[in-house]
């Protein structure tokens, strides 16, 4: 089958899986993971589903907390669209196609690309990238109107877009406008681990629209220790599906190693109320697993900076 046919089949399967899990509980989820582990052919896929089997052995893990929140608070079409576009399009089909190109040409490739929200070039760059197998974008809207993403996202329904935004810009009207996009993950950006009133309001507006969102927190040497404290995790669990941690420039290597170790170990511990993602470590891990040529993509204008590190 061609990509469109395979994607359509995958989308149908995703909707069926969500329905089965809602009706049959997490036993059905484990059944699906076991089936995928059996069918997986490539080592990267086998490793992923083996980890998923391990993670789902305990029903009090943060993975179950995430799945509960997704099923309870996010529209099914959003779950399936983001999952298929990012998971199948980005990390299975797309990554495989990109790896073939890289192995042949020996040139850097990227499954995820950073850009400035509102950049007029994206109307051509996004579909062109999809034609090569790159479907995932991370857009910076921290100093512009986040609603500018809507036309781009609607015009490229097979791509997935992460949208970094200042919580104060995510007004009720803005969030209602963003809700028209099924292939969007909104990422309110907090400059410190402090859960600000603006951050809480933004999260609750997104939740009210049954949207896919992830509070994203910048940390440094002084604040890294806060993100593994139980009271901080509990407060984040009240407001977000999961939490993305990203290191500010200048954060020491020692702090980075400790944070990475704490986040990874915490994912399999019992009783953790919220899943923590590690922007720097997780994307780098995925890149290394896919190909030695995989890197962070960027089409930022010359001289521009980005809120998250790209390397």
Residue ranges: model-predicted function:
Residues 110-120, 129-145, 156-171, 177-197, ...:
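Core AdoMet radical
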Residues 117, 136, 183, 197-288, ...:
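Conserved C-terminal portion of the radical SAM core fold
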Residues 1-46, 50-53, 259-311:
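Accessory C-terminal segments flanking Radical SAM cores
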Residues 125-129, 152-153, 177-178, 203-206, ...:
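Generic structural signal for hydrophobic
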Residues 147-158, 178, 203, 229-233, ...:
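Short low-complexity, flexible loop/linker segments enriched in glycine and/or proline
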Residues 148-166, 263-275:
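Alpha-helix-loop-beta-strand connector modules within alpha/beta enzyme cores
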Residues 42-115:
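N-terminal [4Fe-4S]-dependent radical SAM core
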């Amino acid at each position: 089958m061609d990509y469109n046919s395979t994607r359509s089949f995958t989308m149908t399967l995703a909707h069926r899986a969500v329905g089965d899990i809602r009706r049959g509980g997490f036993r059905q989820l484990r059944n699906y993971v076991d089936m995928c582990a059996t069918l997986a052919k490539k080592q990267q896929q086998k490793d992923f589903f083996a980890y998923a089997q391990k993670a789902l052995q305990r029903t009090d893990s943060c993975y179950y907390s995430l799945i509960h929140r997704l099923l309870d608070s996010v529209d099914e079409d959003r779950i399936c669209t983001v999952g298929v576009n990012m998971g199948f399009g980005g990390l299975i089909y797309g990554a495989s196609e990109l790896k073939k190109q890289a192995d042949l040409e020996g040139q850097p490739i990227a499954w995820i690309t950073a850009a400035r929200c509102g950049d007029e070039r994206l109307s051509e760059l996004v579909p062109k990238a999809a034609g090569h197998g790159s479907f995932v974008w991370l857009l910076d809207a921290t100093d512009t109107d986040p609603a500018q993403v809507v036309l781009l996202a609607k015009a490229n329904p097979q791509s997935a877009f992460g949208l970094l935004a200042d919580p104060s810009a995510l007004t009720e009207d803005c969030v209602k406008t963003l809700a028209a996009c099924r292939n969007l993950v909104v990422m309110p950006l907090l400059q410190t681990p402090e859960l600000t009133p603006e951050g809480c309001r933004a999260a609750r507006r997104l939740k009210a629209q049954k949207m896919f969102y992830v509070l994203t927190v910048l940390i440094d040497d002084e604040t890294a220790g806060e993100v593994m404290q139980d009271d901080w995790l509990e407060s984040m669990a009240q407001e977000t599906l999961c939490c993305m941690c990203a290191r500010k420039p200048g954060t020491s290597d020692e702090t980075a190693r400790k944070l990475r170790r704490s986040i990874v170990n915490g994912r399999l511990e019992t009783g953790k109320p919220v899943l923590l993602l590690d922007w720097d470590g997780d994307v780098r891990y995925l890149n290394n697993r896919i190909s030695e040529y995989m890197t962070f993509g960027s089409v930022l204008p010359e001289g521009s900076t980005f809120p998250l590190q790209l390397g």
